[in-house]
Amino acid sequence: MGEYTLVCPCSGKTVPDHYTLNCDCGSLIRTEYAARQLTLRNLPGMWKFYDWLPASGHTDTPGTTVTYRSEGLAKELGIDLHVAFNGYWPELGADMKTCSFKELEAPPTIVRAKEHGGKAMVLASAGNTARAFSYLSTITGFPLIVVVPKQNIDRLWIPGREPGASVKLISVGGGCDYTDAINLSNRIAALPGMMPEGGAKNVARRDGMGTVMLDAAVTMKGMPDDYFQAIGSGTGGIAAWEASMRLRADGRFGSKLPRLHLAQNLPFVPMLNAWKEGRREIIPERDMPDAKKSIAEMYSDVLSNRTPPYGVGGGVFDAMKATDGLMYGITREEAVAAKKLFEAREGIDILPPAAVAVAALVQASEKGLLEGRKVVLNVTGGGQERLMKEVPIYQVEPVLEVPGPDVPMEEILKVIA
C-alpha cells in the first residue's frame, strides 16, 4: 500500500489519521510516504502510482493521465511542449470517460473513505467533480450524496451505464452557485453517519490530482520547467506543487521545482487580484465584488470558488511563492480562441477550463517566457464531444430540488435515509 503519515506543513507535527481533514493550525495536512522513490506498479490506471496514494486498496478503473509530446501546438507557439491529457482519446490510450481530471480525485478519495469506516460521502460540485464521484459511486456502490446548483445538473451524467442507486443528487435552485452548494453539503455532512468529501483539505483528492505531475515527470524523464493549469479552487495547483516536492526528494527527476502558471477566468478572479497585490488574504469586497454576477459572466463557471484555499498554510499562495509562480486572467474571447487553436493543432476537443489554460500558455509564449524551457500543459478535460458520439451516457436525475442552502434538514432526510 501507499504507507504514509499525515504531517502539518507549518509545525512539522504528525497528525493522527482518522480520515483527518484538519490540523490545529488550520493548514492543509500533507502526506509523507514511506516510499521515498517512485515505483510504478502493475495496477489499473492511476493506481500505477499506488505507493504515493493514501489508500490500501484500489479500484479497477482505467482512468489516468496520458502525457505526450506536442507537435502541432508546440510548433505553432515555438516551444518545447508536453501535454498532460485527461479525458477520452482512444488512440492515445486515454480512457477517462468522465472526460475530466476530477476522475483522478474520486478513486483514492472513495477508497480512503471506505477504509476509514465511512458509510456515505457528501460533496458539492459545479459539475465535473460531481460527475467523477457519481461514476465511481456507481462502479463501487459506495453511497454518495451530491449537491449541485440547478443550472449545472446537465453536467451530471454517467458514461456507459445507468446511474447507480447509490447516487443521490440534490439540486439547489434559486440562482444558487457552487458556494451555496458547498454550504448545504456542509450541513448534510454534519448529520450522523455522513462523511464530508473534504475538498482541498482531503489528501486523497490532492494526491490523486498530483498524479498528473507524476505522469508528466515519468514520461519526460524529469520534471518540467513550467506547468500550466486553469484553477477555480486552486487545489490542482497545490497538488502539482506537492507532487513536485516528492519528485525532487526522489532524486531522479531534477532538483528545481516547476514554475506554476495558474489561470483564472475573468471576470471572477479573486486569487489573481490578491496575488497581484502580494496579499495572502482574499478581501471579498475588493477581490470579488458582486461575485454571483461575475460568476454568471464566466466562460467556464466551474472555475469559480468564493472560498478557495488560497491563504491557508500550504495553499495556493504558498505554492506560488515556492515556485516563483505566475497567475493569469483570461477573457472569454481568449479562451474561445485558445480552444479552437488547440483543437485544430492537436486533433481533440477540450473542455472550457482546459481552454483557459491554453490561453495562458499562449500569453506566456508570446511574452517569450518559455524559450528554451520544458513545458507541461495540463489539459484538465477533453474528448467529451467525441465520447458523446461513441459512448452512451445516462443523466443523473435529482431526488430533490431545494430553493437554497438553508432548507430544513427534515426535507433532506426524507430522500437520503
From Swiss-Prot:
Self-association and partners: Homotrimer.
Keywords: Coenzyme M biosynthesis, Pyridoxal phosphate, Transferase
Lipid metabolism in keyword set: no
Name of this chain's protein: Cysteate synthase
Top-level taxon: Archaea
Residues bound to pyridoxal 5'-phosphate: 128, 380
Modified residues (N6-(pyridoxal phosphate)lysine): 102
GO molecular function annotations of the record: ATP binding; cysteate synthase activity; L-serine ammonia-lyase activity; magnesium ion binding; pyridoxal phosphate binding; serine racemase activity; threonine racemase activity
Obligatory cofactor(s): pyridoxal 5'-phosphate
EC number: 2.5.1.76
Keyword Transferase: yes
Recorded catalytic activity of this chain's protein: O-phospho-L-serine + sulfite + H(+) = L-cysteate + phosphate
InterPro entries per record: Cysteate_synthase, TrpB-like_PALP, TrpB-like_PALP_sf
Biological role: Specifically catalyzes the beta-elimination of phosphate from L-phosphoserine and the beta-addition of sulfite to the dehydroalanine intermediate to produce L-cysteate.
